[in-house]
């Protein structure tokens, strides 16, 4: 009799478990939805910390809200950059990329801030990542060609400029850059004139220099 009771009890628990799990999932989904709405409202009011806190909690309950959280990080980063808080902006773009590493736009936005800080190497790396994700985006090649030019890398700047013109043959900025780069290439290819032979004569200034008393 005792064994029969135990069996019935275990069987009853097994039947209840899916129902309990489903009830918890429904509760979590409702809570996540509420938190996401709170986050969206806070974001609308530019209450960034509150928005991020709400969306972090929503994402912990339901991962589908992760993209919303990434978007708020982007918004806060943009606001920080607008206020010249560039390091804060870079930090928030980094958080957004942890959530959405396939979003080329975030790499582009962070690169723009890095250029404000004159950190061309990091900006170059971010534009390169953006290009991997969107290889036909003219804007990314245009910005990267500019960075290469600033760094004095004429060869790679020309390669990116040619890519821009292949995708957008009438791009005026690229046409101007190509002409400028061609001029630089020709100047580099022209050998420097020989240095004048050293004169053995004393310069006029030296000839009339005052003697020590």
Task: Identify the role of each PLM range.
Residues 32, 66-70, 104-105, 138-139, ...:
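Helix-start (N-cap) detector for alpha-helical repeat units in TPR-like alpha-solenoids
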Residues 68-75, 109, 143, 177:
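Canonical tetratricopeptide repeat
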Residues 44-45, 82-83, 116-117, 150, ...:
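Register position in tetratricopeptide repeats
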Residues 36, 43, 74-77, 81, ...:
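Position-specific recognition of the canonical hydrophobic site in helix A of tetratricopeptide repeat
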Residues 57-60, 64, 94-98, 129-132, ...:
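Conserved structural position within tetratricopeptide repeats
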